[in-house]
Regions:
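Phosphate-backbone binding interfaces of nucleic-acid-interacting proteins
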Residues: 1-106
């Protein structure tokens, strides 16, 4: 288990998907360009089996904004998209109401 202090270090922010495309080297991954208000980030997400890239453009998502960059199959990811999954289903985590890009999720 993590402590509340450790959890408070995680920076969750609302982002708006500006672009989405299939990862060139991975069947399960999408490469997203996400507006976080003060900057745009590239995020690689394992949601390709559940979402068409075009359906994500313009939608709001919740991302971990202070995660160290990682390279996934040759493409840098500058954050992590949050999603819920159960019994093979997957749903991207979104704010319940429209929020500005970069809004803090608490």
């Amino acid at each position: 288990m993590i402590t509340i202090e450790q959890f408070q270090q995680v920076e969750l922010r609302v982002g708006i998907v500006k672009e989405a495309a299939a990862h060139p080297k991975a069947d399960r991954l999408l490469v997203l360009k996400v507006d976080l208000g003060t900057e745009e980030r590239q995020i690689v997400a394992g949601i390709r089996a559940h979402y068409d890239p075009e359906s994500l453009v313009g939608t709001q998502v919740v991302v971990v904004a202070n995660l160290a960059p990682a390279t996934l199959r040759g493409v840098e990811s500058q954050g992590m998209l949050l999603a819920a999954s159960s019994e093979g289903a997957l749903a991207v985590v979104r704010p319940a109401a429209p929020m500005p890009a970069g809004a803090v999720v608490r």
